[in-house]
């Protein structure tokens, strides 16, 4: 019934596409206007449109049809490619700030040019986001010819552009291509800069995200982090690892309804959620081994955390599946692409736990200096759009998190690929034997085959079997991806057999010739279902581009993780009832539906996880926005810093009276004026006779102290030129703000790590986190204000010449910039992307400056930040 109704009325997507198609006719009629024009005439016509939008005379909507028509005509002349009508629909979907779902080979790169050209008319910049440097360089170069013809400048941000001036030049272009991590890290670095002119990014106007599902869904659990070393006890990791090895893995025992849950062993592994649950027996054993009474008490939170990570390292994370050991290092394997993510480290001590497990050198844990998730970074843009071949399965998440609707664009030519039912075997061995038999069948007639695997381990197993059968083949996994694009490009040639993990080169088309078409096209064999239907669809989509012939089929076994964890018993029962013998398989739509149901369960779990991360990051995001906004004000020479200092000074005086226990409404005879005078001497180095404050009301005391501070401050500042005064005030304020913000981020990390334990007390961890983080933030703001006033009050100048003055200012600037450069060495990701080469931005330094929490080199026994590193006296400028 539902199907027949849909045939008559169509789906909502059909109706949306139909409405766009009606608008395409308005573009097509303009072809006869622009086609006869010379190149110069076409460029003049376009410039007139561009100027009308930039000046505000017309809106982008007013010129959309003409812009699209001119872009198509220019593309025909420059690239030799004419946009299809369905590509025009895709361009309008992107312009409207939505996601265009387009099948492999439908020309997404060309579609993007329509929306890019139109939106670049505002002069505010357009960012095109790709998944790797190769695609950013390729697309900016190929499409750049079209943009240049229309008078636009094109930039490309890649990891090899190291200097700020070079990166700024790329961002200043009308259109900029780059990877998601380059854009994100530049944003974080910009908000650590000490001069406004050093910032490289412009405003976040409009972005088109290519492979949007990979970046906004798969990597949404991936906070971009700039970090620095922290002072943590490295012995915790080895100790936790030793204890984890003594703990025995148990399991839940089935009990009758109403009976208490029973378990064996010291801990249970929850494979669905990838967590460890300690049993009562295990808790007691761990407490005995750690020699503590309560492992979950606040003072032992670090021990319980490290033990949990050590147990995860030994029981959940697998070598050659989740990570590899190379050159005495743990290197993460990206779960979605299969690539080695060199330079990326797990956070919260998990990476150190894996290092302890594998017996490699345990590297120092890091402290967060700046952080943002992709979710919150991309929500900075005034308008966001995306394109991919697979988005409908995550349409709800795109809508709820990013406000993006997914519109499926029809193919220009109908898809001819045959997608066959899954074949399900009892065991892994039977399945792999069947895959090899099928490969031999295809290979014997020359039909190319692409075999998709979910891990390095599985691709190596297939590789060994094919080698044994003497079938020539290419293998592409995290251990061998240098020639990735070339191997994938050639996977459609006659007789080619290619084994690839999920990395199978997105953005690189597999083309086939007429001979291969006559053999049936490219055959896709999946060796197991991925947790996400999208990844399976991406593998299928490698075949059948632009109406080519092709086929796809998945080979599964009850040993596969997805079936074993999510619903394998149900399928096993079906197989037992059918009496499936060894080597036989089930080819059933019922079973295929059961597999898809299991995938939906996992997808929902991942969605909840991403939503959970966003809920926590939203709390930090409000704080980050407030600090960054104020920081930007401090960088602006036009900002009235004197008014801010005056406002903060009043708060400082109020705080000082409170410290002296003098409050409004108290009888003045109860005022401890001796304590107040002592505080003023200690904090501000001003000698005051306590009798000076005798018999004064609170308001009078505030006015007197404020006047004293103002007089001293103005007398000191009067020797400076207004511009120098402004710069010194801004730089010193930054010198207070930045370290305080970094310490706050560390406190937030500690809070987040332990907040889950509040659930044991029947409290909602998220609510608790919001309350505690708000308290931390209000304390931070208070500390920044008070510390800034104190530093500015205590600063003394002993310049003998303008040159010495400028040298002293430059000295502080360089120190702040050195901290930023140092931090740039420590870019990392919590769970999912390749970090940059840490040597790139390495500053040239002499003697290494002590970190804030290091012991002071003067030998006082105090921490550096509480001794010679205080925001107080400095040679030349501060005394």
Swiss-Prot record:
Gene giving rise to this polypeptide: secA
Catalysed reaction equations from the record: ATP + H2O + cellular proteinSide 1 = ADP + phosphate + cellular proteinSide 2
Lipid bilayer topology: Peripheral membrane protein
Record's subunit section: Monomer and homodimer. Part of the essential Sec protein translocation apparatus which comprises SecA, SecYEG and auxiliary proteins SecDF-YajC and YidC.
Domain of life per record: Bacteria
Single GO cellular component term: cytosol
Family statement drawn from the similarity comment of this UniProt entry: Belongs to the SecA family.
Enzyme Commission number(s): 7.4.2.8
Binding site for Zn(2+): 856, 858, 867-868
Xref: Pfam families: P-loop_SecA (PF21090), SEC-C (PF02810), SecA_DEAD (PF07517), SecA_PP_bind (PF01043), SecA_SW (PF07516)
PROSITE patterns: SECA_MOTOR_DEAD
Cofactor: Zn(2+)
One Gene Ontology term of the molecular function aspect: ATP binding
Residue segments, region Disordered: 834-879
Keywords annotated in UniProt: ATP-binding, Cell inner membrane, Cell membrane, Cytoplasm, Membrane, Metal-binding, Nucleotide-binding, Protein transport, Translocase, Translocation, Transport, Zinc
Source taxonomy: Bacteria, Pseudomonadati, Campylobacterota, Epsilonproteobacteria, Campylobacterales
Protein's recorded name: Protein translocase subunit SecA
Location(s) in or outside the cell: Cell inner membrane; Cytoplasm
Residues that span the membrane, as ranges: none
